[in-house]
Amino acid sequence: SMLMVMGTSTCYQMMHRNKIAFDGVCAIVRDGMIPGLEAYESGQPAVGDTFAWFADNMLPQQYQQAADEGMSVLAYMDRLCGQLKAGESGLVALDWFNGNRSVLMNYGLRGVIAGLSLASRPEEIYRSLIEATAFGARRIFDSYTQAGVGIEKVYAAGGLARKSPVTMQIYADILNRPITATSISNSSSLGAAVCAAVA
């Protein structure tokens, strides 16, 4: 099973009986999570940060009406982009706005949004950024599968997993598998507390 801890960045963690080194894995640690198993870790350096950058820098004033409706700007954008079909806008993006951790491990790479026109709307750009991060996740999943480290189930924790059903559905569609999101609001803090309690 793969765990995606989704927040400002996304950390991918899973355990496997065997150590299989392959491109795109940031670390493999024996007994790193559970004694007797190899703990694998990969990641994307900017996921929630990309969405926040977009909301802070790219939205025209009329989209700030979300505050008048009592919701965050990103929740408002989720609502708008949830009404769009996949590929409807023709926009394509690469999620390298803070470089690439997995699988290329090159922090000098930069993000791209292609297909923009004078008719491109903010919600279309926002959806292209969500899709870009989801395809980045797909590339990570594919590297595990191609190396023989199978992924049977997918779990998601962190702020994005709880706050954005639209993002989670886009990820599930692009990964072509269901995702189970935790209902715990601060799962990382809870996990740290459990580890401290049993140490």
Model-derived features: where do they sit?
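Active-site core segments that coordinate phosphate-bearing ligands/cofactors
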Residues: S1-A199
